[in-house]
């Protein structure tokens, strides 16, 4: 999360000050850079809040084996931008369900493009709508176990 906040403050927010980043935990909130607390009252409220999101920004973590947050975003038809760290390169189909950036500059670029180009966002979202429900847990489990 520290990496995302750093990229947001340095490379994303200065180029588009109208966009907002919703995050947790609260000690990282910084209204000067449009970083706000995400609402986690209950599951229903959380899903409604997530559905308002235009994109999920998740660089990834080397300790992630699956990243359920990416699958939740996929099923909610929210495009994902990632650096592909950990399992994220397996969760995101580059140019179809989001973008796997090769570096920090690309991460910032793809983030800004999704907010700038409504047709790009619609294309990714339409792809996600078509793919909704296509991942079955028995297949996901087999794929995970095959990596062991």
Where are these regions (language model features)?
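Conserved catalytic-core segment of nucleotide-activated headgroup transferases in glycan assembly
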Residues: 1-36
């Amino acid at each position: 999360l520290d990496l995302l906040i750093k990229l947001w403050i340095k490379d994303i927010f200065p180029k588009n000050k109208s966009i907002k980043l919703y995050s947790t935990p609260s000690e990282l909130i910084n209204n000067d850079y449009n970083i706000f607390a995400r609402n986690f009252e209950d599951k229903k409220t959380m899903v409604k809040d997530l559905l308002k999101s235009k994109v999920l920004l998740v660089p990834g973590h080397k300790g992630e084996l699956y990243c359920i947050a990416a699958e939740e975003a996929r099923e909610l038809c929210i495009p994902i931008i990632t650096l592909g760290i950990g399992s994220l390169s397996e969760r995101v189909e580059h140019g179809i369900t989001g973008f796997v950036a090769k570096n920090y500059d690309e991460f910032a670029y793809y983030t800004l493009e999704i907010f700038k180009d409504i047709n790009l966002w619609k294309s990714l979202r339409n792809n996600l709508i078509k793919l909704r429900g296509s991942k079955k847990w028995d297949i996901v489990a087999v794929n995970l176990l095959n990596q062991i």
